[in-house]
A protein has these predicted regions:
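A residue-level detector for the "anchor" residue at the start of short, highly conserved motifs
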Residues: 1-258
Length: 258
């Protein structure tokens, strides 16, 4: 909460949530925090922190649904401003925004500002990733960065390379970037370095590459997020030239010799 007080959500800790003023601001149930509309002039901001190997859903008072992926932070106010609805994201989240043309919905990341009135889209913006992605599934989106505005239509993706600051707009299959919220990992020609980052946030492990060429190997496929780490390793080793060796909380990755 705004004063630093933390409330842990779990299946054993369900029930009402109150803010610093003692006002009931939501209900925690079934891995979802349902926010309630309240009347307050303070407009305090709360932060939802999703741990590594976790995921959570947030339903805002306006009806907007947010699916937060592991290792993500979402900052949102108890009460939205009269002319706009603003939240802040660090990590990855899927947004199903309630339509309200008079009060646009804005997501701020460390790199960009994404503005919509009602739509479905995914944002990936982890601090330790070398990129930021905005993938549009339905509706329309405007991505603003350093004064420049990029408009997306369904099936289009905004990709920012943080190092070079190059921006690429491309046609993609949105399901490849949104299926995580439905319990699936999907990858299409993804290099092993970026794939390992996604996997490490889910299994709470660290990957160590024995050689640079292993990082550049690419993988296409899908598997259930409920799969164990052992099952994931078996899938990868049976479909790629990569070998995994688990030592404690670290997975060493190498390429098989031919």
């Amino acid at each position: 909460l705004a004063n630093g007080r933390q409330i842990e959500f779990s299946d054993k800790n369900l029930g009402s949530v109150f803010n610093n003023q003692g006002l009931k601001i939501g209900e925690n149930k079934s891995s979802t925090l349902y926010c309630y509309p309240i009347h307050s002039s303070l407009k305090e901001k709360n932060t939802l922190l999703v741990p590594i190997a976790g995921e959570y859903r947030l339903v805002l008072a306006d009806g907007t649904k947010i699916y937060a992926n592991s290792g993500s932070k979402i900052r949102y106010p108890d009460v939205f401003a009269e002319n706009e609805r603003v939240v802040e994201l660090e990590g990855e989240a899927y947004f199903d925004v309630a339509k309200n043309p008079a009060r646009p919905f804005i997501v701020k990341t460390t790199q960009s500002e994404i503005k919509v009135t009602g739509t479905k889209f995914n944002i990936t913006s982890y601090p330790d990733d070398g990129f930021e992605q905005v993938t549009l599934e339905e509706g329309s989106v405007q991505v603003k960065r350093k004064g420049e505005v990029f408009k997306l239509t369904p099936g289009r993706q905004y990709f920012l390379d943080k190092k070079s600051e190059e921006i690429v707009l491309a046609d993609v299959d949105p399901i490849l970037f949104t299926s995580w919220k439905d319990g699936l990992f999907r990858f299409q020609n993804m290099d092993m370095l970026n794939l390992s980052k996604k996997i490490s946030r889910w299994y709470d492990i660290r990957f160590d590459f024995k050689d640079e060429r292993s990082k550049k190997l690419r993988f296409s496929g899908a598997f259930d997020r409920k799969s164990s780490l052992d099952e994931f390793v078996k899938i990868m080793e049976s479909t790629t030239d990569v070998r995994f060796k688990l030592d404690g909380n670290t997975v060493f990755i190498s390429q098989t010799e031919r």
